[in-house]
């Protein structure tokens, strides 16, 4: 694993909140620059969760290979550390074949862990701990977890910027898993911040209302594409499909399946949950260093992104 952190292969990332057109831009850049896509979406790794995760369709791929998609059954677990290892293997293979690895997705923890080379504790974490921490981050926000870190490991907290959520989670994971402070480890054991030469393109809209309209429209289209049936499958298997059962796009319909709500309020709840999630995504990516932000609605978006990518590759 240590060798992978010494690589300086070029990696492109297309990030941002949901419904900003990341997939289409990633595919366009892959076509132009000979790239392949590595999905950085925590739910698209699962088979059968297609509509609710806005998984890329065969038509939308334009023949570009997409990796880290449809690899696991919904009852299997997949952690941030698992993704980092998988993405590292994929990057090595793609670079060896002369392909540009293009990371596309909105799971900020995945993107930041891979690009910035954050290692998680080598000791096996208790089952579900990483998922629990990720859920706490989404529910409570980064400030609350940073405050917890200050209480249990003030030395580590002092050395970590509050906005570096990946390292905050890593430190908390280490403490909860081992009962020991991360600050007790030698600094030499920590990996360098950025293992790859990366260009990170972020997509957003100038007006928040425009993003929200796009999200609402996407939910309506998901309903037309069969989201309700997919959510019913998750509901029927909710004990086994623990991760999916907590995911936005499925849990909002459980009251309907239990006869506790009409369908329309569930759809509206999903739209609101998606808007809230988009705000959290924006907060995460706005705190990431080096993101080049682009107007997702700009007529010259693809041309602008292509120019930046060409400059990035040429400078290599």
Feature map (PLM): residue ranges:
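Phosphate/pyrophosphate-binding catalytic cores of soluble transferases and nucleic-acid-acting enzymes
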Residues: 1-316
């Amino acid at each position: 694993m240590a060798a992978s952190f010494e690589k300086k292969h070029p990696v492109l990332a297309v990030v941002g909140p949901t419904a900003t057109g990341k997939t289409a831009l990633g595919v366009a850049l892959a076509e132009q620059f000979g790239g392949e896509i590595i999905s950085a979406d925590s739910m698209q790794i699962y088979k059968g969760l297609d509509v609710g995760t806005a998984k890329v369709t065969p038509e939308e791929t334009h023949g570009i290979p997409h990796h880290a998609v449809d690899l696991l059954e919904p009852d299997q677990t997949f952690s941030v550390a698992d993704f980092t290892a998988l993405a590292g293997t994929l990057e090595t293979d793609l670079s060896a074949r002369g392909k540009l690895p293009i990371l596309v997705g909105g799971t900020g923890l995945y993107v930041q862990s891979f690009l910035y080379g954050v290692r998680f504790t080598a000791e096996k974490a208790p089952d579900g701990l990483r998922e629990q921490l990720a859920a706490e981050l989404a529910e409570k926000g980064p400030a609350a977890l940073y405050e917890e870190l200050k209480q249990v490991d003030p030395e580590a907290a002092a050395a970590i910027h509050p906005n570096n959520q990946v390292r905050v989670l890593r430190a908390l994971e280490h403490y909860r898993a081992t009962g020991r402070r991360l600050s007790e480890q030698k600094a030499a054991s920590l990996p360098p911040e950025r293992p790859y030469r990366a260009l990170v393109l972020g997509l957003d809209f100038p007006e928040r209302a425009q993003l929200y309209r796009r999200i609402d429209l996407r939910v309506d289209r998901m309903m037309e594409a069969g989201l309700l049936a997919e959510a019913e499958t998750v509901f029927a298997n909710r004990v086994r499909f623990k991760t999916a059962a907590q995911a936005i796009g499925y849990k909002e319909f459980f009251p309907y399946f239990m006869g506790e709500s009409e369908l329309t309020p569930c759809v509206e709840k999903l739209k609101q949950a998606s808007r809230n999630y988009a705000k959290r995504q924006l907060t995460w990516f706005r705190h990431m260093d080096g993101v080049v932000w682009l107007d997702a609605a700009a007529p010259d978006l693809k041309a602008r992104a292509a120019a930046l990518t060409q400059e990035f590759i040429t400078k290599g």
